Amino acid sequence: MTQVESRFAGGGAEAGARLRTLADLVSDGGVLVLSGAGLSTESGIPDYRGETGRRRRAEPMTYQTFTGSAAARRRYWARSHLGWRHIAAARPNDGHRAVAELARRGLVTGIITQNVDGLQQAAGADGVVELHGALDRVVCLVCGDRTPRARLDERLRAANPGWDARAAAPGTVNPDGDAVLADADVEAFRVVDCERCGGVLKPDVIFFGENVPPGRVRDCFALTEAAGALLVLGSSLTVLSGYRFVRHAAGHGVQVAIVNRGATRGDEHARVTLDAPLGATLRALLAELDARG
């Protein structure tokens, strides 16, 4: 086992060979990264499905439910208000930092993230395409005004004095920023409206059942076609939103590499797959590239 392989959590000859194949692809440059929730798990933000591909939790909020029910919006904002501090406190991990370093070296020339946590940008990466939006922004569904989530947090605290202390009992906040609340706490929560027009506010993210803006999708397809390779990090590719870019890459002769915990929907299109921890794998990738000079 080489020195680089010994630092790779996957270890062993097969893992080392897969790592070297990954390094071959990345060293040629022009790499487009497509990242999913698995890249942020080491920052304390659980992914949706885990290694088995099965959803960990109950069905998330849908766009149709959110827009069609004031009660659903109150429940969403109460839980999200309590849990937002967890997302806001998360910090980039080794995987995020490795992607940013590959970009600084000019090997990664584009990043599409399915994540809404902003951690890849916090690690220093520029020009990240936020496929599903970002939790640190809020948008009005009537006038389209966008404001920082921190401003909404201030307004919700002012509208609900003492509510945080009453609701935030130990153990009520899940690691993903969602919060387990009693019905009475939800009923007591007051939602605020757009400061500009009084319209309904929504996090600036793509809910399940909501379409990604067509222009954003076109930009991602263009990035995929121009790439020398597509590197998928931490995504099971179960939903079409991300999988379509893998399929598009394969259809245009762009080589695909996938690093994820567990199998993915796109494995059949990949030149190489690694079922291994993201942080350790990407650290080992950097070490392999450094060893090559």
Enumerate the predicted regions with their spans.
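Conserved catalytic core of sirtuin-type NAD+-dependent deacylases
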Residues: 1-293
